[in-house]
Structures are given as C-alpha cells and as structure tokens.
A protein has these predicted regions:
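Conserved short alpha-helical segments that host acidic/polar catalytic motifs at enzyme active sites
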Residues: 1-249, 253, 262-297, 335, ...
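Hydrophobic alpha-helical scaffolding
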Residues: 7-10, 101, 121, 138-142, ...
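Gly/His-enriched, cation/cofactor- and phosphate-binding structural elements
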Residues: 11, 30, 38, 222-224, ...
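Glycine-rich oxoanion-binding loops at beta->alpha junctions
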Residues: 68, 72-85, 276-290, 313-349, ...
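Glycine-rich, anion-gripping cofactor-binding loops and their flanking helix/strand elements
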Residues: 183-208, 305, 331-365, 506-540, ...
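Generic C-terminus detector
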Residues: 230, 545, 571-612
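Active-site phosphate/pyrophosphate-binding segments
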Residues: 263-267, 271-299, 389-518, 528, ...
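Glycine-rich phosphate-binding loops that contact phosphosugars or nucleotide phosphates
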Residues: 293-435, 439-442, 524-527, 531-564, ...
C-alpha cells in the first residue's frame, strides 16, 4: 500500500526521491515525506499530509534539502490519523535514526510500553515509530547500526518493508523485508530501494527482489544482501523489460483510459505466444499431464477484480474440466479451514503478485499439500516466486488503481488454462476446443472493435451520471461480469452499485427498483438470453431505466424493450466476459469523469494491498 523509495549515490537525493514517489502515486496515499542525510551527517526530515505536490513545494523541488543519500515514503494511514506527525519518515528521540515502513507491527503496543518504561518519549500514534525508537535503544547498547537492526527484527512481529538511516553511518541505507514487497536496484556508483520497480526504472533496470527475512545494506559501491541469520548471500538479478514510457500517460488524460485502450495489445501479448497450430501451448508450465489428471478439486483464490476473474473461471472451468471448482476470497480462505490436499490445484490470481491476503492463502494451501499455479502480471513478484508454477499475463505496468488490462489478461490466461487442461483430460469436444482457440486468436481485434463504441458510451454516461444507485443484473457468466462492472463503477465514481444474479430479483432485490432506477442488464450469454429478457421486462415494468449489454446478434431483440443497448461482437460463449467488460470499464470511466472524480487515484483505495 505505502510507497517506498531510497537512493545512495553521488547526485542530490531529494529530486530523485520526489520523482520516485511521483511514480508511486498510483498506489494511493494520504501523506508523504523524505529523509536525507546532510553533508554534515545530520538527518533532514521533511513531511506533510496531502498530495505529493505539497511536499515538493515545501522543499522547492528538493533544492532545500542537500545530500546524496536518502529515503522517501508515501503513506496510507493504518495506525494514527493522516497528519504531519504520523507521516513517515519517523525519527528516533535523539534524531539519530530515520525509518520508513510499509506493513503493520503487530506487537507495537507491547514494545512501546517497554520503551516508555525506559524513558523514551513518543511523538506519534504510529506503529512505525516503535522501530525508530527501538533502533536507537539498541544502538545505545551496542554502537553498531547493522547489529541494532538485527536486534530490532528479532523483537518486532508482523509485516514490514523497512528502510533505515543512521546519522552515524551516513554512507548507507539498511533495508529489511517480511510479508511486504521490497526490491533493490543496482546502478553505476549508486544503489536504489523501492516498493515497486516503477519508482526506479528511470535509473536502472537491474533489480533484485528481496525475500522474507532478508536484510540489505545499500552503499554507493553496491548492495550486500544477508539472510535472516545475518549471513551474506548472493541472489539472481532480474532485468526489467518494459519501457519507462509504459508507466507514463502517453497523451491520455488518465492512466485508466490509456490502460483500457491498451487492452488489444495486452491481450495479444498474453495470447499469441501461447497459440501454435490451433493448439494452446504453455512452454512456461511445469505441470505434467499426469499431475493434471491427479487433481480432483480446484480452488481459485484471489481478491477484488482478480476474484471476479475467478468467478468467470469457475463457470468456464467446471464446464470444460468436469471438476469441482471453488472460488474463494483470499482474505477468507486462510481462515475457513478449506478442504485442500495433494490432489487439489489452487490457482492464485494477482496483478501485483504481492497482495498480502493472497500470499497468506497461498502459504496455507501449500502447507496442506496443494499444487500452486499462479497467474500474475509482475515478473519476479513474491507470489510468482513462491508458487509451484506461474503463468505471466505480460500486460505491462498498470498504474491506475482500478484494474482494466490486468483483469482482461488474467481472464484470457485462465481461459487458456481451462482449454489446455480440458484437452489433456479429454473433457472438451474437439469442435468446441477448436472454436474457442480460433476466437482466442481473434479476441484482441474484437476488443479493439468494441473500443470503437467510446462515443456512444460517453453520451450515455453524460445522461446518467447523476444516479446515486446503479444495479447490474445477469445470469451465469453475465452475473460474474456484472460483479466486475459494479466494482468498477463504485470504486472510481463513488456511486453505490450492486450486482445481482437475475434469478434472485424476486427474492428481495426487486423491491429496490422504482421509477428512474438505473439497471444495467447483461445479456451477452446466448444460452440464457431469453431468461435475461424476461428479467429486463420485470424491471422495466417497475419503472427502471435499462441500459443493456448484449451481442450484435441479439441487439435487435433487446432494443425493443430497453432504453439503450451497447453491443459486443459475437464470440465463443466462454470468451464473452472478455469483450463485455470493455464497455463496462468505459461506462465507469466516463461516469467518473462527469462527476469530477480522481479517476486514477480513488479515495481510500490502494493499488496493491500489502496489509491485512
């Protein structure tokens, strides 16, 4: 959730830190700050509540803070209100240490009470200040920065990505990680620390992803990594492939619109390398046909939009594989005592590969003997590293908080997994398989065709942005699609929205429908189109304004009943959500635009949720 960036080199640190934090703004935050070691070996800490611009103005773009080593932080409040005092970096009582932190120190109350009993005075309400004060406490005992860090790590419990500065050791940053993302960047005569590669790709593409329990010492001469026993270790370096421009708006007013428009290319990258001669081929999959045949149960585990991908996947995989498929919210899975064993395949879906709840669910499933296949976007992320198998979506960086192209590519990869496994199991008809593979190859072009309806969607959004409640209804795949459409609308436009299975209308939901209520009726799934139409008639009879989404072949019939119709090209039934989501993304975007919302950075939301 929080953004972290650190720099050790020969250039002025503050402008580099501010630029890095600006590239992390998409993660969401309520305050920001930097700590820079001055030429006189003093810690200069500047922080403020609000947008990063306020911090930049405070330090005149970094010109007021001299020094070539420092750290920056953007904070989402968890412990303590969002204000200047609770913002990071936090400084120890005598000003010797500065700390930035992403995560939650679970035993901070106990540690705080101990330190207070030793005469330490606290300034903030945060859990993070405990780390700074504890560092100084142990440093006063042993006089060694690295040893003090080790002692602190042995005392604290919970999740953390930590960056630490010591005024007595002005040539280094020490970093530590447990259950929160942190990576190291290697440059010529400089070193970098970041929670996300986006912050430092302008300066280096050579990175190492830290694992739990590791400590890193960053200096101008390089970075030394240590394991939890404080023994030196060497790790594989990763080269970031995507371009800096991929994390910039490229002329679009918002990252979200840019990423919606990038979906044809993103899908092409995810699909094309895996289609050969009418077959789906996963060169990067270690699973053997024998192992696939051994699975008698499948769990799909995810959060947010990735969970909605899983909902679509449940319908498609059960149909294709004739296996029981369950979809679980990661935050619930680990506490639900799931029936998981060595004959269970657990498919983990995550854009960032760092979502804490999803990581915890992965570890719980692994502990019970399950085989873990993850579908992630970020190469080398924690989930990717801890899985038995990983399939990358290759969508490129996604900056807007509301996911678009990550959802589309996750769905495409999951559909390909279903088809590939069904072919191995012999549970899919040859003609159905061949048709789906043909349509997969055409999917990027059909998404591009769907994006051509922007003007029509924008006009309809301009007529309906005033609604305070919007309901999505659909059956089967359309219900799963409605869940994602509803989430998109509520998270960026702040309109109350719910998605309901159409067959449940009479069981209570229909009491909410009255004159002028906006209902978005999803009728793309051909086998249940007549059922969808009967539900449309029901809500129209109660005065609803109905915006329908259907296929081109059903447009004429739907238009006879509803107020407005959006269409997508016809395709294989299992792929319809991949097309249907595009108009819903655009509708949400244009509604939020009409309402003047902060589309790329919705209030109270973070791109990657790395705390419970």
């Amino acid at each position: 959730m929080c953004g972290i960036v650190g720099y050790v080199g020969s250039e002025q640190a503050a402008p580099i830190l501010l630029d890095g934090l600006a590239r992390l703004e998409y993660r969401g935050y309520d305050s920001a700050g930097i700590a820079v070691v001055s030429p006189r070996h003093e810690l200069q800490v500047k922080k403020t509540v609000g947008r990063l611009k306020a911090l930049s103005d405070l330090v005149h773009g970094g010109a007021d803070v001299e020094g070539t080593i420092g750290m920056g932080h953007t904070r989402w409040a968890t412990h303590g209100a969002p204000n200047d005092v609770n913002s990071h970096p936090h400084v120890s009582e005598n000003g010797k240490f500065a700390v930035i932190h992403n995560g939650i120190i679970e035993n901070y109350v106990e540690l705080k009470e101990f330190l207070i009993s030793q005469g330490v005075t606290f300034k903030s309400e945060t859990d993070t200040e405990v780390v700074a004060q504890l560092l100084e406490f142990y440093y006063n005992e042993c006089g060694d920065f690295f040893e003090s860090v080790g002692r602190v790590l042995r005392r604290i419990e919970g999740a953390y990505a930590l960056g630490m500065l010591c005024a007595d050791c002005p040539d280094r940053i020490i970093a530590a990680r447990k259950d929160a993302p942190l990576l190291l960047g290697f440059g010529e005569g400089c070193s970098f620390l970041a929670s996300d590669a986006t912050a430092i790709i302008k300066h280096t593409r050579d990175v190492v992803y830290m694992d739990d329990g590791e400590i890193a010492v960053l200096t101008r001469g390089g970075i030394q990594l240590y394991n939890a026993m404080q023994q030196p270790i060497e790790k594989e370096h990763h080269h970031i492939e995507w371009e800096v421009s991929a994390a910039e708006k490229g002329g679009y007013p918002h990252f979200m619109l840019k990423e919606i428009m990038e979906q044809p290319d993103a899908l092409r990258h995810a699909i094309a390398p895996r289609l050969r001669g009418g077959e789906i081929v996963f060169d990067d999959l270690k699973l053997t046909p024998e192992k696939i045949r051994s699975f008698d149960r499948i769990f799909i585990v995810a959060c947010g939009s990735s969970y909605h991908v899983g909902m679509v996947g449940k319908y498609n995989l059960e149909h294709l594989l004739r296996r029981n498929v369950e979809v679980a919210l990661a935050s619930e899975f680990r506490y639900s005592d799931p029936i998981v064993d060595d004959k269970t395949l657990v498919i983990i879906i995550s854009q960032s590969g760092e979502t804490l709840d999803t990581m915890a669910a992965l570890r719980e499933a692994k502990k019970r003997g399950a085989y873990i296949l993850s579908i992630v976007n970020v190469v080398g992320s924690s989930i990717a590293r801890e899985s038995d198998d990983v399939l990358y979506t290759w969508a490129g960086p996604e900056i807007a908080v509301a996911t678009t192209k990550a959802y589309s590519t996750q769905l495409a990869v999951l559909d390909m997994v279903g088809l590939c496994f069904a072919k191995i199991l012999g549970t899919v008809r040859e003609e159905e398989y061949a048709d789906a593979v043909r349509e997969l190859a055409l999917l990027p072009d059909k998404v591009k065709e769907t994006l051509g309806h922007c003007e029509d969607i924008q006009k309809y959004a301009a007529q309906h942005f005033h609604h305070e409640s919007v309901f999505f209804i659909g059956r089967n795949l359309d219900y799963a699609l409605g869940l994602e459409g509803s989430l998109k609308l509520k998270e960026i436009s702040y309109i109350h929205s719910e998605a309901y299975a159409s067959g449940e209308l009479k069981h209570g939901t229909i009491s909410l429908i009255e004159d002028g209520t906006l209902v978005i009726a999803l009728g793309t799934y051909g086998p249940l189109f007549d059922k969808a139409m009967s539900n449309v008639v029901e809500v129209k009879a109660r005065g609803a304004d109905v915006l329908a989404l259907t296929t081109e072949s059903h447009c004429g019939e739907m238009a006879k009943t509803v107020d407005h119709v959006l269409t997508v090209p016809d395709t294989a039934a299992m792929l319809l959500p991949s097309l249907g989501v595009v108009p819903l993304q655009l509708f949400s975007y244009y509604i939020a635009l009409q309402r003047g919302c902060d589309i790329d950075k919705p209030r109270n939301l973070a791109k990657s949720v790395t705390v419970e």
